[in-house]
């Protein structure tokens, strides 16, 4: 257990935020270089976990749905949309890899129901084939 966020993330390679917070509590100055952040909690207007400087200071930003992230994700607090926002779909379809040579990458997840359903089907099919043999 850590007394504060700064101590909790000081040596992290991966940070996942998943709270119902309405105020940013993660500061870019506390995030180590070469760290990846999964921001999951901001999934509606008014919710946030990241201070604006985390978005501004991220080298790569990936979103499950960029337009939805600009409306109800962490990106709703950014004064201008980043030109280098990559959708998760394009990252996968284009078979891209995200190189992180000295910076912070951010995944702003707002939740896309169809992706959740597709993943559930894939997991079920895999489970059925391996465990049930059908």
Predicted regions and their residues:
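Basic, amphipathic alpha-helical segments enriched in Lys/Arg and hydrophobic/aromatic residues
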Residues: 112-117, 122
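Phosphate-binding loop/pocket of nucleotide- and phosphate-handling active sites
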Residues: 122-134
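Beta-loop-alpha module in the N-terminal Rossmann-like domain of NAD(P)-dependent dehydrogenases
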Residues: 18-26, 44
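Rossmann-fold NAD(P)-binding glycine/threonine-rich loop
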Residues: 31-35, 40-100, 117-119
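N-terminal Rossmann-like NAD(P) cofactor-binding module of classical short-chain dehydrogenase/reductase
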Residues: 13-16, 37-38
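Short acidic low-complexity segments
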Residues: 1-12, 26-28
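A short glycine-threonine-serine/GTX helix/turn-capping micro-motif
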Residues: 105-111
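General beta-strand structural signal in soluble alpha/beta enzymes
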Residues: 1-2, 17, 63-64, 108
């Amino acid at each position: 257990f850590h007394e504060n966020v700064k101590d909790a993330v000081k040596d992290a390679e991966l940070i996942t935020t998943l709270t119902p917070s309405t105020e940013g509590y993660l500061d870019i100055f506390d995030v180590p270089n070469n760290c990846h952040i999964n921001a999951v909690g901001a999934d509606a207007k008014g919710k946030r976990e990241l201070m604006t400087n985390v978005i501004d200071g991220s080298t790569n930003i990936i979103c499950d749905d960029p337009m939805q992230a600009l409306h109800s994700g962490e990106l709703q607090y950014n004064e201008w949309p980043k030109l280098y926002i990559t959708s998760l779909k394009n990252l996968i379809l284009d078979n891209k890899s995200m190189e992180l040579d000295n910076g912070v990458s951010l995944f702003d997840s707002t939740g896309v129901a169809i992706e959740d359903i597709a993943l559930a089907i894939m997991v079920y099919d895999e489970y059925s084939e391996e465990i049930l043999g059908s």
